[in-house]
Structures are given as C-alpha cells and as structure tokens.
Amino acid sequence: MPMILGYWNVRGLTHPIRMLLEYTDSSYDEKRYTMGDAPDFDRSQWLNEKFKLGLDFPNLPYLIDGSHKITQSNAILRYLARKHHLDGETEEERIRADIVENQVMDTRMQLIMLCYNPDFEKQKPEFLKTIPEKMKLYSEFLGKRPWFAGDKVTYVDFLAYDILDQYRMFEPKCLDAFPNLRDFLARFEGLKKISAYMKSSRYIATPIFSKMAHWSNK
C-alpha cells in the first residue's frame, strides 16, 4: 500500500520529503490541501480532517506508512532516511548530519519570519546583508566534500539543497562567491531520480510559502 504524504499545495516544509521519496523510488500518494484566498485564508480543507487521521500531534506535513503515522517534517525525513540507510554510516557522518539538519531549520526560520512579516519590505534590506555570512558558513562546512555528511548522499543533502535553493531564489547572486555550494546544487539536481522528478508535473518549485506570505517567489 502506498504511503500517504499530506501537506498544503505549496513547496514549504515538504520539499525535502517529496524529493527523498522520489530519490528512494518510494510508493506514495499525496494529499494536497488548498488554502483559501485573502482575507480569510480559509483552511477548512485541512481543519475538517485534522483530528480524524489518528495523528498524535495533528499537523502538516504528515506521513502515513501502514501503522506508522508521523508528523514533524524532520521526523518524517529521519524515518525515511533510516528506512533507506541514508542517515550516515559513521559517527562522524551522523554528527555532521545532525548539525546540518538543525542549522538548516534555523536558516529556514529566519527567511520565514521575514517573508511573513507585515514589515517585509522595510526589513528586507537588512536581511539581505546577513545572507553572505550564512552562505559562508555553509560553504566552509561543506568544504571539498561532495555531500554535507561526507562522501555519500544522506537525508540532510535534501534539506541543504532546499534551503540553499530558496535563498538563491530570494537573492540570485548570493552563491556567486561560493563555487562549492553552486557545485553542490548542480550535483544534487544531476541525480537521476531528482532530475526526472524536477521535470515531472508532480514537482512544486514554487510557491515556496502559503498565500499569507509577503514573498513566495510565485
């Protein structure tokens, strides 16, 4: 029976999960919920089902795989990574994966807080000044490695790709000074299953955020 992945009909937190499902050639169906337009941003499509799915902490995204019902995006990613042995082979790789996972969440939240802020246009110039240092740290951490944990693909490469790509959309020149990050993105996009997925009708590159955001690269 196919797994069921539930989320809004946007890129959002589920982009790395969708790509990992595709990369592992997993059998899954998507339940995509649609949010209403302004000013109400009606969420009844999701709210009508929220407490009927048997989820311990009802939220989006969720993944249902037989008797396993999982919420929290990183918990879903880690579950899939363990299932397909993409969570690092050595302690050093697992440590690096843990660091990147949490660093990506910080970097993502900073962009989210800006894009949903009513003062988006006023705060954007100052935010742009902080991007080079963020990218510099990712570049130094990656170094000459092909992947963020080491020599092999792990689940955190899906997270890292997603956030670096979002920042590249937000500020197209932000990776100009970091050739290893640009090479990483190209390497990831060149993975056979990922390349095929990105060309398919199932792929959602944008909008990144919900209709409530002031920037979503629509």
UniProtKB/Swiss-Prot annotation:
<feature type="binding site">
    <location>
        <position position="116"/>
    </location>
    <ligand>
        <name>substrate</name>
    </ligand>
</feature>
<feature type="binding site">
    <location>
        <begin position="7"/>
        <end position="8"/>
    </location>
    <ligand>
        <name>glutathione</name>
    </ligand>
</feature>
<comment type="similarity">
    <text>Belongs to the GST superfamily. Mu family.</text>
</comment>
<keyword id="KW-0808">Transferase</keyword>
<dbReference type="GO" id="GO:0071466">
    <property type="term" value="P:cellular response to xenobiotic stimulus"/>
</dbReference>
<dbReference type="InterPro" id="IPR010987">
    <property type="entry name" value="Glutathione-S-Trfase_C-like"/>
</dbReference>
<comment type="function">
    <text>Conjugation of reduced glutathione to a wide number of exogenous and endogenous hydrophobic electrophiles. Involved in the formation of glutathione conjugates of both prostaglandin A2 (PGA2) and prostaglandin J2 (PGJ2). Participates in the formation of novel hepoxilin regioisomers.</text>
</comment>
<dbReference type="InterPro" id="IPR003081">
    <property type="entry name" value="GST_mu"/>
</dbReference>
<dbReference type="Pfam" id="PF00043">
    <property type="entry name" value="GST_C"/>
</dbReference>
<dbReference type="InterPro" id="IPR040079">
    <property type="entry name" value="Glutathione_S-Trfase"/>
</dbReference>
<dbReference type="GO" id="GO:0042802">
    <property type="term" value="F:identical protein binding"/>
</dbReference>
<dbReference type="GO" id="GO:0051122">
    <property type="term" value="P:hepoxilin biosynthetic process"/>
</dbReference>
<feature type="modified residue" description="Phosphothreonine">
    <location>
        <position position="34"/>
    </location>
</feature>
<keyword id="KW-0443">Lipid metabolism</keyword>
<feature type="binding site">
    <location>
        <begin position="43"/>
        <end position="46"/>
    </location>
    <ligand>
        <name>glutathione</name>
    </ligand>
</feature>
<dbReference type="Pfam" id="PF02798">
    <property type="entry name" value="GST_N"/>
</dbReference>
<dbReference type="GO" id="GO:1901687">
    <property type="term" value="P:glutathione derivative biosynthetic process"/>
</dbReference>
<dbReference type="GO" id="GO:0005739">
    <property type="term" value="C:mitochondrion"/>
</dbReference>
<dbReference type="GO" id="GO:0005829">
    <property type="term" value="C:cytosol"/>
</dbReference>
<dbReference type="InterPro" id="IPR036282">
    <property type="entry name" value="Glutathione-S-Trfase_C_sf"/>
</dbReference>
<dbReference type="InterPro" id="IPR004046">
    <property type="entry name" value="GST_C"/>
</dbReference>
<dbReference type="GO" id="GO:0006693">
    <property type="term" value="P:prostaglandin metabolic process"/>
</dbReference>
<dbReference type="GO" id="GO:0043209">
    <property type="term" value="C:myelin sheath"/>
</dbReference>
<feature type="binding site">
    <location>
        <position position="50"/>
    </location>
    <ligand>
        <name>glutathione</name>
    </ligand>
</feature>
<keyword id="KW-0597">Phosphoprotein</keyword>
<dbReference type="InterPro" id="IPR004045">
    <property type="entry name" value="Glutathione_S-Trfase_N"/>
</dbReference>
<feature type="binding site">
    <location>
        <begin position="59"/>
        <end position="60"/>
    </location>
    <ligand>
        <name>glutathione</name>
    </ligand>
</feature>
<protein>
    <recommendedName>
        <fullName>Glutathione S-transferase Mu 1</fullName>
        <ecNumber>2.5.1.18</ecNumber>
    </recommendedName>
</protein>
<keyword id="KW-0963">Cytoplasm</keyword>
<dbReference type="InterPro" id="IPR050213">
    <property type="entry name" value="GST_superfamily"/>
</dbReference>
<feature type="modified residue" description="Phosphoserine">
    <location>
        <position position="210"/>
    </location>
</feature>
<feature type="modified residue" description="Phosphoserine">
    <location>
        <position position="67"/>
    </location>
</feature>
<feature type="domain" description="GST C-terminal">
    <location>
        <begin position="90"/>
        <end position="208"/>
    </location>
</feature>
<dbReference type="InterPro" id="IPR036249">
    <property type="entry name" value="Thioredoxin-like_sf"/>
</dbReference>
<feature type="binding site">
    <location>
        <begin position="72"/>
        <end position="73"/>
    </location>
    <ligand>
        <name>glutathione</name>
    </ligand>
</feature>
<dbReference type="GO" id="GO:0004364">
    <property type="term" value="F:glutathione transferase activity"/>
</dbReference>
<feature type="domain" description="GST N-terminal">
    <location>
        <begin position="2"/>
        <end position="88"/>
    </location>
</feature>
<comment type="subunit">
    <text>Homodimer.</text>
</comment>
